[in-house]
Each structure stands twice: as structure tokens, then as C-alpha cells.
Amino acid sequence: MITMSRRAESRQIEANEVLDIRGEVCPFTFIETKLKLEEMKSGEILRVIIDHEPAVRDVPRSVEQEGHEVLSVEKVGEKEWSILIKKK
């Protein structure tokens, strides 16, 4: 579970890349995220913006299985979430 302080910290983390995949559904949310991470360098941070509720659970779990670090998952709108991922 992400605490309020961690949520506040996530707003201060500057992402190297932003992937806006609102409108996409699973499994495409993970596929797009994985492809974007493959383009990035180790240690860089990706902010993924999604609006497909099942992806809020599935994308973080899948990228962690790939070895990346999920820094935060935060609801940023009525039906939008921001996921911060640090590439392994």
C-alpha cells in the first residue's frame, strides 16, 4: 500500500519519459509499457498514465516481474492513474 507521504514524494520525482496510454486496455497497457521501458536506459524513470482500472493492478505486477521497480501508483483523476517505474 502506498502511503500519503509516498504519494506526495511521487509528485516531486521527475520522470525521464511519459507514456500516456489512456484508452488502451489490458494486455496492451503492459505491452506498451514494456516496449517503452526497452527504449530507456537503466535507472531512468517512466511515468505511465492509464485509465483502464484493471491495468492499475496488472501493469505494476508485470513490470516488477520483469525486474523493474514500481516507485508509486497514484490516482490523479476521476478515472486516471499515474504509475512511476524505475527501469532496472
UniProtKB/Swiss-Prot annotation:
Domain of life: Archaea
PROSITE patterns: UPF0033
Annotated active site: 26
SUPFAM superfamilies associated with the record: SirA-like
Gene3D superfamilies linked to this entry: TusA-like domain
Family listed: Belongs to the sulfur carrier protein TusA family.
PANTHER family in UniProt: SULFUR CARRIER PROTEIN YEDF-RELATED
Name of the protein in question: Putative sulfur carrier protein AF_0554
Species whose genome carries this gene: Archaeoglobus fulgidus (strain ATCC 49558 / DSM 4304 / JCM 9628 / NBRC 100126 / VC-16)
